[in-house]
């Protein structure tokens, strides 16, 4: 039996029997792609020498978020002149490291280097995507199963590097490919890398606006699942079997600004999708159940439009509140009405690049300067702790097995009660 046939059988079995992912963090935004973990009892306080179970010296910088399955942690990293895929055990010891691709030129002081997209895993294999366009599948021993060149859909022409993270769903990898040379969404067989379909995605952005740094997600709900893509002035949904467009959110670039690049990804939940834009644009929320056509204030699916938006960090929902994080304030918005609950400055003066994570009614935030904040979820603004790792962090935290993992430019930290 060939490796690809064996992998196809493995993926089919995984799709038939839902994986026990409660203790894992299989993709960039967690088990349900919404930034939530069911873990309880995570420490609110940590530092270089406090509640750090271990720290692992990473080969180099990168903003990819670790994915975790069982005893294995995977992430990509710059490693000299290469992009490497690294596997570290939950004991903090390296299991293996393999070269994925040569590394290209970094953008904006390593904010846009070729180790920006995050990995995905199903517990048997791990998929990594490098900034030169190589998307590859590896087994848990680090052996490459297949590789594909995403630049076959158009030579990359994007200002700050490739950040799109492929989403793994029931044996298929879905990827949005959006820059000045092409606007499309594609579906690849996760077992072989072969294309299932490619759908063109028209947009009307000009100048820099076609450049997109957000990632696609799969929405699950009545009438779904659907692939949700975000970029080039619109957020769209596509049928998983064909890529056909089902709906699109309009009015995200109301002034047709030519520098309206989307970085923050949408929040996708069964009964609410929250769509950020950028800079001084709006945030749009709507009910995706049965949604069709153009989502705008005249469409009954639309619930609210908020006057401002996060520019980089994806929204997160805890209970009946949606949280929007900018470089200074944290804004809480009523999930049903869009009314502002509070808008408060965070105590750490830093830029935020990684996404928020929610666990045990707390929101975990780590900024670019390595200062982590734990905020109590609810209608009252309360910062429970401010924690400084004293190194740059662009990645989002990951939660698995009772541990919080924070990937910095120098170390991967495992945080937990010792």
What is each PLM-predicted segment?
Residues 1-9:
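Bacterial N-terminal signal peptides that target proteins for export
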